[in-house]
From Swiss-Prot:
UniProt pathway: Cell wall biogenesis; peptidoglycan biosynthesis
Source organism of the structure: Bordetella pertussis (strain Tohama I / ATCC BAA-589 / NCTC 13251)
Entry-linked InterPro entries: FAD-bd_PCMH (IPR016166), FAD-bd_PCMH-like_sf (IPR036318), FAD-bd_PCMH_sub1 (IPR016167), FAD-bd_PCMH_sub2 (IPR016169), MurB (IPR003170), MurB_C (IPR011601), MurB_C_sf (IPR036635), Oxid_FAD_bind_N (IPR006094)
Any one GO BP annotation for this protein: cell wall organization
Gene3D superfamilies named in the record: 3.30.465.10, UDP-N-acetylenolpyruvoylglucosamine reductase, C-terminal domain (3.90.78.10), Uridine Diphospho-n-acetylenolpyruvylglucosamine Reductase, domain 2 (3.30.43.10)
Protein name: UDP-N-acetylenolpyruvoylglucosamine reductase
A single Gene Ontology CC term: cytosol
Amino acid sequence: MSTVPARIEPVAPLAPQAQDLRCFNTLGLASHAPAFVALTEPSQLPALSALAPRFRQLVVLGGGSNVVLPASIDGLVAQVRLPGVRLVGQCADAWVVEAAAGENWHGFVTACVDNGWDGLENLALIPGTVGAAPVQNIGAYGVELADRFHSLTAWDVKGGRWVEMGAAECRFAYRDSFFKHQEPGAWVIGSVRFALPRPWQPVLDYPDLQRHAALDGAAPTARAVYDAVCAIRRAKLPDPAVVGNAGSFFKNPLVDAGTRQALLGRFPGLVSYPQPDGRYKLAAGWLIDQCGWKGRQLGAAGVHDRQALVLVNRGGAQARDIMALAAAIQGDVERRYGVRLEPEPVVVPAR
């Protein structure tokens, strides 16, 4: 972790205003922020550091695709909209590409594929922004952000400084990172750099992906993998613009080999995936489906009828409805399998 030399530039002012957040979260939950600011340039970050102590809490938003927002937020909400994508450099074994935190993640992946900067195609169509991606260490179809990560710059809100972090400082794990264990609002990611491998090799660990990416027996290209991932996700997952959702709501639980073997003895159809450390990742969607939750509804919240991992807003849902449904699912899964499901989204407190 190293401090980035301060840039000499004027401090852009921030003037908080009230904001309806219904369109700022993909679950479409009714939420109100009495104090809201949009961060559109790095020079605004010092002003954010000066402003934040006046409020009970600082809530940093990206695309709002991995959050559960309360009806009202007692604090300052800052949405990161920093723009920009550039090729930083290239060497024999990698392209180094940088994207600002406010860039749409899928748009960034598409730009990389279009430019021949291959390696992120398995992560296509994941909602959200570039800045939120390292926080969650997003992953799909055999690739995690950590696999392609180079470094990032983040603003230390209390310290009032830019800090550069490598993979070791970010402490990536399954859907986890350093940032998820810090005080909320302590850091604002400004930009992320990716090391995209040269030569490129496809990652086709999932059977669905193998079938979709095969083109007349020819070796798949990054574009073919990208198209396959998009097709699979569109077939399985609801569009947040049509049905409010936050993508996969639960992490796939990790268990040791003994626990997995005991579960297989009772449930022969158990879906699991071996991990490099000897543990097994259980398919949370399968566990939920087997408990009979797929397609069910509890109040204004429901479980998607094609993907049991996805909780949806059936219209007018609030945070309490989503969390009540999540708790009911967790209880049923734990009673049947002895496994506790952990939610993926950040649940923002009202205060």
